[in-house]
């Protein structure tokens, strides 16, 4: 196509995937794992009969779900160094870096969404199963760990994966703190070689292929879970 040079993509593939996509996938996996763990804890807090705990978790979830992600990224990027200085009793802000700030941001932000998913999963389990656990001599935490959470997690796997696809796409926002994710790496190449259309078109195709492929996996899981039920 006249005026376009798509060879720049081939020349930059190594950098884009070695540095950019590795950053994106690693951040996605870490934020997914830690976000689900923290989100499950938040879900249990929201379902707690102790009202102050339930209200605290609810306030956190509502706060995170009401603020644009890009603002949360900025907030943690500039705030975490001061929190680190306070914890370590340092006179100056602690140097944290874009990577750690991104991990903390996405863990804290996505936990609010994973919380609501896990809360729905826990509430979908028949109350009788909880009482059965107590009848067997299990305490609350054992009942949740051995009976309720495994079933809730299995039921919610498709929804959790759907949220993870959104998380994968949202990681592209870390470019605002100069992190070199897949989009950030493409932006550097685009600005260096003045090939914005070519690079951003390629990035869009890659995100579409990965996200659409994962959505097909989610659909297949939903069908399998429906059959098991």
Language model: regions and residue ranges:
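Transmembrane alpha-helices and adjacent helix-loop boundaries
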Residues: 1-229
């Amino acid at each position: 196509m006249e005026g376009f040079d798509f060879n720049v993509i081939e020349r930059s593939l190594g950098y884009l995937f070695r540095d950019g996509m590795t950053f994106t996938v690693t951040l996605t996996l870490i934020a997914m794992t830690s976000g689900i763990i923290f989100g499950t804890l938040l879900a249990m807090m929201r379902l707690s009969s102790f009202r102050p705990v339930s209200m605290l978790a609810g306030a956190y979830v509502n706060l995170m779900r009401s603020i644009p992600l890009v603002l949360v990224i900025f907030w943690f990027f500039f705030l975490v160094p001061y929190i680190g200085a306070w914890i370590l009793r340092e006179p100056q802000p602690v140097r944290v870096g874009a990577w750690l700030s991104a991990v903390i941001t996405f863990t804290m932000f996505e936990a609010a969404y994973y919380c609501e998913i896990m809360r729905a999963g826990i509430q979908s389990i028949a109350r009788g199963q909880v009482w059965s656990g107590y009848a067997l001599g299990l305490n609350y935490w054992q009942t949740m760990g051995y009976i309720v959470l495994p079933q809730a997690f299995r039921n919610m796997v498709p929804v959790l994966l759907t949220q993870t696809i959104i998380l994968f796409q949202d990681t592209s926002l870390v470019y605002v703190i100069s992190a070199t994710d897949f989009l950030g790496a493409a932006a550097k190449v685009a600005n260096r070689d003045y090939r914005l259309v070519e690079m951003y078109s390629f990035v869009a195709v890659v995100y579409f292929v990965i996200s659409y492929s994962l959505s097909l996996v989610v659909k297949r899981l939903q069908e399998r879970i429906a059959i098991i039920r």
